[in-house]
Regions:
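C-terminal "cap" of GNAT-fold acetyltransferases
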Residues: 123-149
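Conserved beta-strand in the GNAT
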Residues: 43, 49-58, 63-70
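Short amphipathic alpha-helix that is part of the acyltransferase structural core
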Residues: 1-27, 45, 142-144, 148
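Conserved active-site alpha-helix within GNAT-family acetyltransferase domains
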Residues: 104-130
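A short, internal acetyl-CoA/4′-phosphopantetheine-binding micro-motif in the GNAT/acyltransferase core
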Residues: 69-76, 105-106
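A short helix-loop-beta-strand connector motif used in the catalytic cores of GNAT acetyltransferases and
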Residues: 33-47, 65, 138-141
Length: 149
């Protein structure tokens, strides 16, 4: 079941995100990062356990980002990630956000969700705020993908 994250979900979200960060797939987050962004997070809960998360971040009036997309080991390849993305896209549509992007290593996954690969330079510079915290800021190897609502 996909649902809005609650404060009780913060430890599980933190674990999911930071486990993926240890694999070099995303940036680490502090508990404060998660608490401050809890309203942006959705989770997938199965059998009382949070097994996936994602957040939709509105960056400007015309663009948002799907970030912190993570699914627990043992639950991958079950469609959970796709459902999290679809839920973020429905929210974007509902609030009138025309474009959503992500920076990812999982281009095939995002292509299957309807995203198209774009040149990172085609994105407005304001979308790269989190990149300043990344050790790969000067040699980013993630691919930019975008979805037009």
């Amino acid at each position: 079941m996909i649902r809005q994250a609650t404060l009780n979900d913060v430890p599980a979200i933190l674990s999911l995100v930071n486990n993926h960060a240890k694999q070099g797939l995303m940036l680490t987050k502090s508990p404060l990062d998660i608490y401050r962004n809890i309203l942006n997070f959705i989770v997938c809960e199965q059998d009382g356990q949070v097994v996936g998360c994602a957040r939709l971040v509105v960056l400007w009036k015309d663009i948002g980002e799907i970030a912190s997309l993570a699914v627990a080991d043992g639950y991958k390849r079950r469609g959970i990630g796709a459902e999290l993305v679809k839920t973020c896209l429905r929210t974007a549509r509902k609030i009138g956000l025309p474009r959503v992007f992500s920076l990812t290593y999982q281009t095939a996954f995002f292509n299957a969700c309807g995203f198209k690969i774009v040149d990172r330079e085609s994105l407005p510079h304001k979308v790269f705020g989190d990149c300043l915290k990344c050790p790969k800021v000067d040699c980013c190897d993630e691919t930019a993908v975008i979805y037009d609502i």
